[in-house]
Amino acid sequence: MEMDYLVEILDDYPKFEIVTSQMSYIDEHYKAGTQGLEHLKNLNLGSIVKNPLRNNCLIENIPIEIKELFDYSDIKRTPLEWALQYIWNRDDVHCLINNIKSLENLKEHIEVASRSYVNSFSENDCEIIRAVAIEYW
């Protein structure tokens, strides 16, 4: 439903240059989701993603089932790395906004961002992320 609203708003108000939306690996089909990001890309609009950690729910108190799924990856990542890299892996995201709570947290975000780039996930990593998202839902 939210995708319809996004399209309607962008059609009615064509002066937008950038759009902010919530997105994480468990939000692919929530609100405008990945379909919304792709639509923005097709319109040559910038996209800002906020809250990729879902208020830290994706990095704190991780269930053992999720940890076991992450362990199937050839590259070992922290939950923070999985969440941020999922966003940076996309070619339709221009900026990421997240709550930074400490200097140490900022340093960790910078370190992850410095190793992140578009299309860096392997097919196996994409399958793992899909499985993790399903497990959360």
Each model region followed by its residue ranges:
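Beta/alpha (TIM)-barrel catalytic core signal, keyed to glycine-rich beta->alpha loops juxtaposed to Asp/Glu
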Residues: 1-137
